[in-house]
Amino acid sequence: MTTKYQAPLAAGWLIRAPSLLSPTQRHWLFRPGALTAGLRQLGKVQLRVVSEHAEGASLDEARAMLIAPGSPVWVREVLMSVDGIDSVPARSLTPLAASHGSWQGMRRLLTRPLADMLYHDRGVTRSPFVCRRLSSPLPFYRMALPPNHDGSAIWARRSVFWRHGQPLLVAECFLPDFWRKVTLGRAIPPLKAHDRRA
């Protein structure tokens, strides 16, 4: 997989992790390759589909995908747990027409991760990662905020995959319980060969 030029940044997104974050946080926010592969090095990963639906693209997400705000998009929201601990909510979206075309596989994943269709296709390119602290009114914030949130910062990353000129925006955030888990274990697992792809 090759890396594509990043679209103009939407407000709040950063091309580098701020210095206030720990090395472990910076590692996970900009870790290359499939995130699920990294999570599996920490424990048993389970994926639950929270929602699949059509909506209008927000200004923030539309800018990342180079489409007009309000354009119809297909959204898939999931929650990944590690050893039973809710760890990583993820939100993926693509133009509605692309969900029946270039990215139609997104509709057939069920409980399989997006990596199953992204990292085996040489025709797919990906933008560099950007990160930010989640806040309202971002759509991802409403989905990702855990019921027992203690007020601590929730950091997210996102990138855009491109196939046949069609974007697929993938955002992932790391919940406070995830950081507690990696702090207790090996905070920065070594990358395996198949994880080193950009």
Swiss-Prot record:
Subcellular location: Cytoplasm
One Pfam family it belongs to: Chor_lyase
Enzyme Commission code: 4.1.3.40
Record GO terms (molecular function): chorismate lyase activity
Protein's UniProt keywords contain rRNA-binding: no
Catalysed reaction, written as an equation: chorismate = 4-hydroxybenzoate + pyruvate
Example GO biological process: pyruvate biosynthetic process
Membrane-crossing segments per the record: none
PANTHER family linked to this entry: CHORISMATE PYRUVATE-LYASE
Protein name stated in the entry: Probable chorismate pyruvate-lyase
Organism: Bordetella avium (strain 197N)
The organism's taxonomic lineage, starting at the top: Bacteria, Pseudomonadati, Pseudomonadota, Betaproteobacteria, Burkholderiales
Gene: ubiC
